[in-house]
Amino acid sequence: MSAAIWVVVPAAGRGTRFGAPLPKQYLQAGGQILLAHTLDALLAHPAVAGAMVVIGQDDADWPGWNEWAGKPVLTCIGGATRAASVLAGLQALPETVRADEFVLVHDAARPNLSPADLGRLLEVGRTDPVGAILAAPVRDTLKRAGDDGGIDGTEPRERLWRALTPQLFRRHQLSRALSDAAAAGVEVTDEAMAMERQGQRPLLVEGSEDNFKVTTPADLDRFEFVLSRRAG
C-alpha cells in the first residue's frame, strides 16, 4: 500500500460545550494532549504520509510541531465552521498531493482510532471511485419526539448508521463538494454529507464503538480509562 495518503485534522474548534479552559484537543490524557494521541493513531499507519492540522486564527495552545512519528505535520488556519476548516486544509496540502489522490479527514478529538479500523477503511475505500467512511450501526431504539416532548413514534433502525471518522475521499471531489455546499448556504456536518449533495454514495465501513469523540468530561474519563487498561 503506497504511503501517499495525507490526513486533514480539523482542530480549529474551541470546544465550548466541553466547558474546559482549553479547547478539548489540548486537554491532557495519559501524559499527553488528545491531539497527540490522535496523531499517534493516524501517523503510525504506513500508508499515511503526513498530517495537515487546521488550527484557529488565535490558537495560542498549538505546540508548534512540524513532525510526528517521523512524518511531516503542517498547519493552516481554519474557518468559522468544520466544513470551512476542512476545505482550508485540503487547499493547503502540499503540491505533491495530486487532485485525484485520496485524503483522510479525522476529528482532532477522536483519539482512540484503532489500526485495524484505519487499515480496513483504506483497504475498502480506495477500491471505490467515491470513497468511504467509518461508521457504526445504530443499536439503540430510536424515538421520534413531538413538540411537547412526548413520543410520536419509533424509528426503524435497520439501515441507520452513526457516522465516524476518518472519512476518505479524493481531494478534488471533496473540495468541490464542500465549496458547493458553502456557496449554497448549506451547513454540512461531515464530509460524507457534502459528497451526498453531489449525488455520490460513499461506502460505509463498519468501525469500532471504541472510536468515540471526546465531547464531554465523561468521554475524557472514558478515554483515560482506556489508556489505563492499555498500560496494563
From Swiss-Prot:
Cited Gene3D superfamilies: Spore Coat Polysaccharide Biosynthesis Protein SpsA, Chain A (3.90.550.10)
Site (Positions MEP for the nucleophilic attack): R157, K213
Biological processes annotated in GO: isopentenyl diphosphate biosynthetic process, methylerythritol 4-phosphate pathway
Gene expressing this chain: ispD
NCBIfam families linked: ispD
PROSITE patterns for this protein: ISPD (PS01295)
Family to which the UniProt record says this protein belongs: Belongs to the IspD/TarI cytidylyltransferase family. IspD subfamily.
Protein name, entry field: 2-C-methyl-D-erythritol 4-phosphate cytidylyltransferase
Pathway the protein acts in: Isoprenoid biosynthesis; isopentenyl diphosphate biosynthesis via DXP pathway; isopentenyl diphosphate from 1-deoxy-D-xylulose 5-phosphate: step 2/6
EC annotation from Swiss-Prot or TrEMBL: 2.7.7.60
Pfam families cross-referenced by the UniProt entry: IspD
Broad EC category: transferase
Coiled-coil ranges from the UniProt annotation: none
Alphabetic keyword roster: Isoprene biosynthesis, Nucleotidyltransferase, Transferase
Any GO MF annotation of the entry: 2-C-methyl-D-erythritol 4-phosphate cytidylyltransferase activity
Role summary: Catalyzes the formation of 4-diphosphocytidyl-2-C-methyl-D-erythritol from CTP and 2-C-methyl-D-erythritol 4-phosphate (MEP).
Catalytic function, reaction form: 2-C-methyl-D-erythritol 4-phosphate + CTP + H(+) = 4-CDP-2-C-methyl-D-erythritol + diphosphate
Swiss-Prot/TrEMBL site (Transition state stabilizer) positions: R17, K24
